[in-house]
Amino acid sequence: MKKSIIALAALFAAAGAQANTISYNFSNPVSTTEITQTGTLGLFDSTLGTLTGASLELQGAARFAFTGTNSAAQAQTANITSSTDLFWSSSIAALSAIVSGTDVFLSLSSGPQSYASGETKSFGPSNKNASVVDDLASILASMEAAGGGNFTLTCNSLSGLAVQGGGGNIDTTQDTAAGCGARIVYTYDEQKVPEPASLALLGLALAGAGVYRRRKA
């Protein structure tokens, strides 16, 4: 009888705790590089329950367009790659230490192309998207506050153009734009008050145990 009551009480306790998620996100428009963009995300409100996990997705978007012109007197073969690297920081020091080691890289390559003397080839515009997810389990204490709140993420871009082949005779132009966004997801256990009917059932079980003990005595 005692074991049954303990099991019943444990069942009610388990039913009271429920796993939940809450998320925040932002997205900035694509702008001509180089960019510095900032967005705001929410802290976890610790009054909602116990924070058990958090993950941050860093998102990048870019638009690439470029040309290559063969300035040599003879035909040339070359591969042109346009790229943008997005680097991150945060208003929360512990988070900044994590995201500063994460970059979102985007690129577009022409692939090997043959250029006749004086020929110009154009590539793009082409849109690219990429993202990286960081696990924030090691800094959960920094990601919550009673009543919630906000923090910021900032991204900066470094863009460039690389030419492989062509003997140094491929002249280029580029038009690059980029934008960044982010999404944070919190996982938490919400402690709910048992329903009155459940409390009554537990009370009856405990009362029954008392009667059982008295009869046994």
Regions found by a protein language model. Give the residues of each.
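A short, hydrophobic C-terminal helix/tail in secreted or cell-surface proteins
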Residues: 194-212
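Low-complexity, serine/threonine/proline-enriched polar segments
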Residues: 86-123
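Positively charged n-region of N-terminal signal peptides that target proteins for export
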Residues: 1-4, 213-217
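N-terminal segment immediately downstream of the Sec signal-peptide cleavage site
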Residues: 20-74, 176-180, 186-192
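Sec-dependent signal peptide recognition
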Residues: 2-8, 198-201
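N-terminal signal peptide c-region/cleavage motif recognized by signal peptidases
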Residues: 14-16
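Cysteine-clustered segments with highest specificity for TGF-beta superfamily mature ligands
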Residues: 112-171
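Short coil-to-beta strand junction motifs in C2/discoidin
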Residues: 71-85
